[in-house]
Amino acid sequence: MFKCPERVSIKKKEDILDLPNLVEVQIKSYKQFLQIGKLAEERENIGLEEVFREIFPIKSYNEATILEYLSYNLGVPKYSPEECIRRGITYSVTLKVRFRLTDETGIKEEEVYMGTIPIMTDKGTFIINGAERVVVSQVHRSPGINFEQEKHSKGNVLFSFRIIPYRGSWLEAVFDINDLIYIHIDRKKRRRKILAMTFIRALGYSTDADIIEEFFSVEERSLRLEKDFVALVGKVLADNVVDADSSLVYGKAGEKLSTAMLKRILDAGVQSLKIAVGADENHPIIKMLTKDPTDSYEAALKDFYRRLRPGEPATLVNARSTIMRLFFDAKRYNLGRVGRYKLNKKLGFPLDDETLSQVTLRKEDVIGALKYLIRLRMGDEKTSIDDIDHLANRRVRSVGELIQNHCRSGLARMEKIVRERMNLFDFSSDTLTPGKIISAKGLVSVLKDFFSRSQLSQFMDQTNPVAELTHKRRLSALGPGGLNRERAGFEVRDVHASHYGRICPIETPEGPNIGLITSLSSFAKINEFGFIETPYRVVRDGIVTDEIEYMTADVEEECVIAQASAELDEYNMFKTPVCWARYKGEAFEADTSTVTHMDVSPKQLVSVVTGLIPFLEHDDANRALMGSNMQRQAVPLLKTEAAIVGTGLEGRAAKDSGAIIVAQEDGVVEYVDSYEIVVAKKNNPTLKDRYQLKKFLRSNSGTCINQTPLCSVGDVVTHGDVLADGPATDKGELALGKNVLVAFMPWYGYNFEDAIIISERLIKQDAYTSIYIEEFELTARDTKLGKEEITRDIPNVSEEVLANLGEDGIVRIGAEVKPGDILVGKITPKSETELAPEERLLRAIFGEKAADVKDASLTVPPGTEGVVMDVKVFSRKDRLSKSDDELVEEAVHLKDLQKEYKSQLAQLKVEHREKLGALLLNEKAPAAIIHRRSADILVQEGAIFDQETIELLERESLVDLLMAPCDMYDVLKDILSSYETAVQRLEVNYKTEAEHIKEGDADLDHGVIRQVKVYVASKRKLQVGDKMAGRHGNKGVVSKIVPEADMPFLANGETVQMILNPLGVPSRMNLGQVLETHLGYAAKTAGIYVKTPVFEGFPESRIWDMMIEQGLPEDGKSYLFDGKTGERFDSKVVVGYIYMLKLSHLIADKIHARSIGPYSLVTQQPLGGKAQMGGQRFGEMEVWALEAYGVAHMLQEILTVKSDDVSGRTRIYESIVKGENLLRSGTPESFNVLIKEMQGLGLDVRPMVVDA
């Protein structure tokens, strides 16, 4: 069996932990959302299940009718992902929900169709209307509590906290300049502030004594001794002191005890007092008690309502319901598990499951938060303010959660409709069922809207496998509920210490989105709360163990973490007593005895794409950023070639991107061709795994997706082996560019300003040739004037033009086409208004003629040349207009299909029986297996499974079997569920194919008779103007293609393939490219491939050793000879191999010229841009240039007849036709526009003729 080439490395020990599945972020999240493969009763309260449980039951206003949710059921996709792309439809499954309706007539259960729901492909993408899309994960501010501080204009530091729910009103508490705390509800309504004491009372703490008891510890103090009396002066009362007989109040709770007051209390015969420990008159709580205008629960509620809703009558009922709605109603206010977890953690409340399930606000939360705020104000060392840019306070909303939120809003809309229908339903005339009151429109429209319009649902970047992979791992701070690009400051965009191992500090776009769109680091995972975790090795008693612990940013703060490069001895103990470590985001030299954890790998800091840059540690960060971004723009080449100098991540990136085909199970290759690989399974050779290869498909970016087999018949394969290469891969490794022999030297000035000189040899060898595929589509519709027709019979078109069209009017596959050629001939009925008067007269005299149609053919647009590589035709079949022959042919096809279906079903049954037999035969049943519906015991506990029992189980459905939880039941469940899914899928495929034979493409849009898609492939060779780049941010444009004979050559006669400017290195500080040049040269000469992983690559000394071993110059420089003259250049030049990429900015797509084209409606000036077939704007500065040369006639021509002089344009055309070289310019249309605008302002502006 073919194996990937082994790369040479100087790394002594491999990483302790393998990279996780790189698209797990997407797949895991959506799996949890839908919980596919789980029985209804096994589903957890998450995702779609959670949304249904939240919204239901729905009750009518009089509570006589109740609609309850029972379970949902997902169907099987009708078409495969490839077929959905081909047909331009959405890859989805049907959603059916079982409801129970209870009303006065009884209980009814019904399964209701709720539309379709898009499902994710194995690669982590969605197919929406035939286009692959990715839902980008969003980073947003975590729900919970944040403590902040800001400086007042007077210099005081004011502390505040903010309780942010997942859904609902924000609650803010802010200290003012007088040390009083005010509450703000919702930031938008900040003007309406409420004193915190009033709010506390409104929560139910009515008396001052209750409040003091909450905030202070209360002590009962005796008044018997004189020393007690003296000690109590200046203390604060914790309760009212009241005379029991006369109800006379001697002192109120919160009052400061004076000597006079104490005497009065003593005289009244009071023996002891309740004192608030630690309280004084300057304490914020005591200050607020004196300032509070209310003194009871009722008064506080009314005051709260008045401030929240000024102008409305403040009744107790209204006030109570408002505060309940705001913070204590789960439908309107929800902290979520995350918010509750963060709040409890900060305030020191328990973190058990029961507590975390409380999603609304509690009184204790407000009191706890106020206590913490006061401690913060008092300078308590155990309290701290929160950094909002820290990853402990920012979480990730992945695809599942984003769609869940949209489903919630869709079902909430449905809830209102259901309630209205319940109340308006006429029970006397009809029976109410769930299907009659449920409308699925709300849910369907919300999902459709999200996938097609949301800022986070993006058209997948499919330029190459790396671009695809990065897009799925992208994190965005933009989007609904996120930040705004214009308002985001520097702090949010900046690299934070907590990003280490979680978010890549390098990979981010240049421009306005810098720092807002980022990428997950290579080892990072997202936990159940949405926080990003990174793995560390646990260190115990100075010994680095192999135990791995995933930690969030807040947990990491308390750990001392050593670098992965710290040297260890054979016992996994640190070699030195001191090593570099991190603690609370700061790097320092730590005593190894204090180290608690160690990095898993040096590359855990960076993302996958950044990890593909060799010698990253020698590059400036700005250039590394460009290098990361430009790898995503590399075009897959016709002849792929893996990099000589790699980093070791190439194989994994190719595998997880889904570009290559990997063996799912061990086995032997039984059959291989260009379209399919068949592997017989090792355990059971009768069972086969079939792998379909993708052949010359068009990607989203127009590049070519083509897979080629790497294995041969008889090869023994193991799980994970590469079976076929894909686009931009070579023997299972990523191959984005070519290894090129490069010289760093100036050459006749052609590599000025980063320009690149290339040898013609690269063109001859097709080194940088790539294939582009363009799709052209044409539809024939049934219009009001009649049916459009796809035909070869097109009016006023010569036979030469139609040479490549078949009898049906569609271009033949293999035809070479150029701009203007017809791809599909189409005629459309003409309307009366489109006919000239003489045509109408002839029609009236001679009746209808065939010429009453116009040519609406699909032609090749400008700038496109190539070969027609595929044609797809979709059409509906009319049952009534089928001929007898067609009906006979249809019956034959259906019979063949049924035969194939039965044979596949029989094969499935055999496989199922064998799987059951392998698991159960002669085994003892650990528990009884009961039939769920009939309650019959199918297998007794302890019974031995024989062939008869296995055949009995084989006929049963998983839904009908009940067994006590055990290992055997779990395996049995997996076997039964996978069998049921396979049978269901086979059945759906059979029905779909049968439907297609009978009715054609029934899923075409309404009114479409026929749809034709033509794919034109063009071969693009490297040419002057194309952009190229290395992996270190060293980019440039091809300036000259030099004949091989003229290129500089080495002493051995070998010509250099590319020349780069040496001035591109020192100022850019990307020395990685120089080290890559030297190592590449040494490795190429030795005939090996090397890997130099990030931060643990080849040291300089090792590279020099390799060069000396291969007999190359020690300094890496060689004398070159001029190909033109044969003379030696004066100085030595750095020569070596660099991996260079061709980027998707091809000159062929950018170059553009206009002779004639469209004009703007108002100004009558030519439009701009290639897409509009626009002209080149001759602006103000260009006018100055021509004025400076005094070319008046040329200038006049450019500003009038070549632009917006309408009459002049017509005249100049006539004069050119007649052969007259005469320019008579008129008035430019823009002048007329100016006149009209001035007239619009009421200024009477008219050109006047004045006699000379």
Curated annotation (Swiss-Prot):
PROSITE patterns: RNA_POL_BETA
E.C. number(s) listed in UniProt: 2.7.7.6
Keyword Nucleus in annotation: no
Function text: DNA-dependent RNA polymerase catalyzes the transcription of DNA into RNA using the four ribonucleoside triphosphates as substrates.
Catalysed reactions listed for this entry: RNA(n) + a ribonucleoside 5'-triphosphate = RNA(n+1) + diphosphate
Top-level enzyme category: transferase
Originating organism: Chlamydia trachomatis serovar A (strain ATCC VR-571B / DSM 19440 / HAR-13)
Coiled-coil annotated spans: none
Molecular function terms, GO-annotated: DNA binding; DNA-directed RNA polymerase activity; ribonucleoside binding
InterPro entries found in the cross-reference section: DNA-dir_RNA_pol_bsu_ext_1_sf (IPR042107), DNA-dir_RNA_pol_bsu_external_1 (IPR019462), DNA-dir_RNA_pol_su2 (IPR015712), DNA-dir_RNAP_su2_dom (IPR007120), DNA-dir_RNAP_su2_hyb_sf (IPR037033), RNA_pol_bsu_bac (IPR010243), RNA_pol_bsu_CS (IPR007121), RNA_pol_bsu_protrusion (IPR007644)
SUPFAM superfamilies xref list: beta and beta-prime subunits of DNA dependent RNA-polymerase
Family label: Belongs to the RNA polymerase beta chain family.
Known partners and oligomeric status: The RNAP catalytic core consists of 2 alpha, 1 beta, 1 beta' and 1 omega subunit. When a sigma factor is associated with the core the holoenzyme is formed, which can initiate transcription.
Protein's GO biological process: DNA-templated transcription
Record protein name field: DNA-directed RNA polymerase subunit beta
Listed GO CC annotations: DNA-directed RNA polymerase complex
Keywords: DNA-directed RNA polymerase, Nucleotidyltransferase, Transcription, Transferase
Record lineage: Bacteria, Pseudomonadati, Chlamydiota, Chlamydiia, Chlamydiales
